[in-house]
Amino acid sequence: MELRKIVPNLLVLYVAVHFSQSSEIKVINVLELHDVRQTAAAIENLSGALQTVGDLYITSTFMLPPKLGGVLFGLYDKQDNKKYLEIAVVGKINKLLVRYLRSDGKAHTVNLQNPALAEGRTQSLILRIGGLRRSHINLELYVNCRLVDSAQGLPSFVGLPSEAESVDVRTGQKSYARIQGLVESVKLALGGSLATAGLLIDCPFQGDSAINNAVVSDINAILGDHTKALIGQLIIFNQIMGELREDIREQTKEMSLIRNTILECQVCGFHEPQSRCLPNPCYTGVSCMESMMYPGYQCGPCPEELCVNTAKGFSCQSCPIGFTGPTLKGVGLEFAKRHKQHCVDIDECAELSGSCVPNSVCINTVGSFKCGQCKAGFVGNQTVGCFARRTCETLGYSPCDVNSHCVMGRNSDVSCVCNVGWAGNGNICGPDSDIDGYPDEPLPCMDNDKHCRADNCANTPNSGQEDTDGDGIGDQCDEDADGDGIKNVEDNCRLVPNKDQQNSDTDSYGDACDNCPNVPNGDQLDTDGNGKGDICDTDIDGDGIPNVLDNCPKIPNPMQTDRDGDGVGDACDSCPEVNDPLQSDMDNDLVGDVCDTNKDIDGDGYQDTRDNCPEVPNSSQLDSDNDGIGDECDDDDDNDGIPDILPPGPDNCRLVPNPSQIDTDANGVGDVCETDFDNDKVTDLLDACPESAEVTMTDFRAFQTVILDPEGDAQIDPNWVVLNQGMEIVQTMNSDPGLAVGYTAFNGVDFEGTIHVNTATDDDYVGFIFGYQDSSSFYVVMWKQTEQTYWQNLPFKALAQPGIQLKAVKSRTGPGEYLRNALWHTGDTTGEVTLLWKDPRNVGWKDRASYRWHLSHRPQVGYIRLRLYEGTALVADSGVVIDSTMRGGRLGVFCFSQENVIWSNLGYRCNDSIPDDFMLYHKQMKLRT
């Protein structure tokens, strides 16, 4: 091996051994803390070091995909999730956030700028926390062995509690739990120098002279006299490089300060310093003087003429402008002491018309007033005026068909939507018997919209219009869907022509359509969509790792990251930070039992340790700037320096960074988000969630199957088939109760769809769910056709009545016979189900009839309302129902012992706006009380 390679390696080896034997530095390898005992010992060492050492070094090497981020390392209170110390990477805007608990008990956040950490390659990081035994601490951030930013004079660190077991250590807490990032190392160096910490990640910082001398002496002994000259030159070279690196570091710090100053000036604008006395904040006629004390000015004495001394006494003149009250006259000092002139503030907003421009907010202040932004429904400002926002009611004309209604988008874009029971492009609508979004007959639409084409199954919902054999008859109603001359009921490949009906294995699928023709697989699962069924595919998820070696066989994870070392990769681990090889999840909430605390203060379905807003309900967990703080409790969602609401906000593009706040048309929406508020490349008019870049369209292709009676005697599980790119679901079996639940969680939501039982046999339950948090906590809308007592009277008798029911499920027992009978029973079941509303008509569903539902849920106020249509007629309306059992959750469909059910033309849309009928209901409730 070449000498130039041997020497550096020996240097590192020697110094590493030297430091490991030294009492001045201790190193904690965070990724090797696998159990409570090891973690507690590490916390005790760290807590002691914080009282004795001057510096703490946090080192890490990791790989993070571009623009992603998450929490790299953190110390938390196990009880209330309080952050003692947290280090988060915000790759989207190149920041490292350091959050810690100050000595006064308050949280403090430091932004370290421009660390390019999310570039899809391995990075090394050192965070130096200096001055631990002083009144103020300093931070220095090194990336790839270079200083990139620092912060001085910060509030001191509170330290750690004496009970080491109460502190939780986490790494990669947020984004690393599901993304394909890789954390190679996270280590804490307690004490020592930058040079010693640098050796942990192969950064050759210049150390002290004693170390260098010891290294030289031992290296000479190893290599002999022939290399002394070369070693000497290398030492001198390293010293020169160290000096140069120190100079560059100082220059980098100075440039960082200059850069930050420039950025702040760009946000605030370049202007001359403004006088605190312009305009004069003091009373009229009173002088104003600049002052170094808060608030930056000082007012002179009040005008003498307000109190006039007379020959026989005194008189008080009229109250100052902005106040009202009587004048006062009197004689003698005692009279003046007993009688005071009282001046009361005038509410200019109430008493003076025209104080602000019409349709704007007027704010009364003591002695004056100020004008705010335009009122709701109006756009503009105090300069140009406030004008009515464009609405369907103010158009003055109707662009829509007589059987459609007008919808106004976020940016006053007008669109027309056909009414229930009608279909078309909105400008032209025709009858739609099966309510799947396609008219019975073709319509003469100018834009050639696909929804103007005639329905190829006019009486059976098929919102995808699938037609395998191209004969103009949709698969859903075609007796021979593949056109091979064999009827569907007899065809072992219903959608693939195969006249020979060859079937080499024992399942019900012919070879022509069997993705494992020689291995029985009735479910035909094909996770990676490569045409080869999972049961015979050596790489089920298609990530290039064979199943026998893949720690997540069904979820692509080429990096094979496994932080807890349990053999289950982070990408599919329900407890990625806790050793849990069994992966048990009894309540089906996607959190493994070993780390499932079921502590959820805000009731949004996310336990406090995983909730990015633990005290504010936010089931969507939206975090637009990826800073670890959910938008619902983040004062600056896009982290552009403009607060969402408070001055100098409100931010006119809350989710898109725009410190300039340019708004050319003065409509209150910034130019950068004018037509795409969340910047997800889908215009707001077409976006299912215009204020969430994570959701753009209705899609149930990825769903979780939940069995509600896993121990039932019949034990027939539902068979779910998803069509139309996730907007249609079909259930084919006469099954035990079950759910198909999408993975997208919502705060406020509008959920709609068409339900159709495509058979004349059986008479049991069909419906849908919302607010799903786990298999014991969800809302369900369920509909029985006829009255029937459940055939198993244990554990209790359950009677189902016909009609639509809205239930809140909060089960003590979870999936099993108790919950099964409670769902079947019409009414309340203590500890299991609460009946919130039942259709008083007591009418069951009809065979082969289509019904359209509209469900509105606003968990922030507990508002629920269900409307059901048969054809064009509204046949059931729950009215306003108030319940806050679940504060948001996921959506899905439900069936219980009913086969051949179609949920078609499904649609959801994020909506947190409070409906008008809730306000009316609220007023009525107040009047009653």
Swiss-Prot record:
GO molecular function, one term: calcium ion binding
Record organism: Danio rerio (Zebrafish)
Cited function: Adhesive glycoprotein that mediates cell-to-cell and cell-to-matrix interactions. Can bind to fibrinogen, fibronectin, laminin and type V collagen.
Protein's GO biological process: cell adhesion
UniProt TSP type-3 repeat ranges: 431-465, 466-501, 502-524, 525-560, 561-583, 584-621, 622-661, 662-697
Record-given protein name: Thrombospondin-3b
Disordered, as annotated region: 602-651
UniProt entry tagged with the keyword Glycoprotein: yes
Residues annotated as glycosylated: 45, 381, 618, 911
Domain TSP C-terminal: 701-915
Key words, A-Z: Calcium, Cell adhesion, Disulfide bond, EGF-like domain, Glycoprotein, Repeat, Signal
Laminin G-like domain residues: 24-192
Feature: compositional bias, Basic and acidic residues: 602-613
InterPro entries xrefs: ConA-like_dom_sf, EGF-like_Ca-bd_dom, EGF-like_dom, EGF_Ca-bd_CS, NOTCH1_EGF-like, Thrombospondin_3-like_rpt, Thrombospondin_3_rpt, Thrombospondin_C
Family: Belongs to the thrombospondin family.
Subunit structure: Oligomer; disulfide-linked.
Residue ranges annotated for the EGF-like domain, each copy included: 345-384, 388-430
